[in-house]
Amino acid sequence: MRFDELDLENEILDGIDAMNFQEMTPVQELTIPIILQTGTGKTAAYTLPLLNRLVREGNSDNRVRSVIMVPTRELAQQIDMQLEGFSYFLPISTTVVYGGGDGAGWDQQKKGLLMGSDVVIATPGRLLSHIANSGIDLSHVKYFILDEADRMLDMGFFDDIMQIVKHLPQERQTIMFSATLPPKIRQLAKQILHNPAEINIAISKPNEAIVQSAYICYETQKMPIILDLFTNNPNKKTIIFSSSKQKVKDLAYALKRRKLSVAAMHSDLEQEQREAVMLDFKNSKINILVATDIVARGIDIDDIALVVNFDVPHDPEDYIHRIGRTARANADGVAITFVSEAEQGKFHKIEQFIEKDIYKIPLPPELGEVPTYNPQAFERRSHHRNKHNKKRYFKPKSKSTPQNNKGGL
């Protein structure tokens, strides 16, 4: 289905055309008509109908009209950039609200919120701080959107979100996007949604253009493998993902000692530092970015040739998000995952999830012997360790327990 088949304002269609968008993705095709009726991916699925409704309703001075809640400042910035493109021909104002930076950033955000903004894109903690300290009025918000809601809950934002909801009017349109539906998400949905239309879309598999492979190794062999890898491929634009800030710092330091063009991205960096690193990486001033999952979702850089998972991600969906940074815009890409003994069970779940046996690269002989790939043994070992702790992971079956009253979407 094409965008010009939708009942969108001409100025919005002009913005879509200027961004070279023509055909809708499945999530856009399913969600845009519903959002329009009731009130590059999922961001456009809600921003386009939102802009359309804001334009048709006309401007409203000194009021916040819509709030888009996101887990990270990086995603907030990306959505703001996409909104700028779509609304290029529209009289729409946006304010981006996230932590970090200096006092000037806080003052600028406060000014935008107090003067009124058609669209506020915010992280929960920062918006709650402005509500508490800046006298922000959200009583006229008509559209409340939660993007990556599951990730926000993983980061501990449930209470912040519920506090923000208390400042919103009862009559509003609420839209929630979530990659997964754990009990906590269903609880949130039950509390903030009213008779929602539920749309389920199959989780996408990795791009077929990505060549996926893995090294089965001991944990102590990972650093020698990475150094060997970049001795032979020093100029490939690469993201190396690790689940630990300390590992990110250690990796970046080790690669810099090899005179490689590398930078680190993690939550200890100030906002200005993060933006400078991403700009240098996008402009190829650095070739290798070592990062935590802070950049696994939503970073729009088309020419990344290689993704390395220094650690196996905890969830299969995180794996897809990580390797999805390569093979973009019809390009080819390579994804390599380092799998230690303890990570074999997690890696096997990824293979099951994507329904593919990932090729195991033989380790260079000079790096020594490698462990046997036997993930079932590690799964059995993990099950044995946890069999006495089931109450931590499963709800009691008693009807009197609060968990059983959470309901569904």
Outline where the language-model segments fall.
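Conserved helicase RecA-like core
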Residues: 2-371
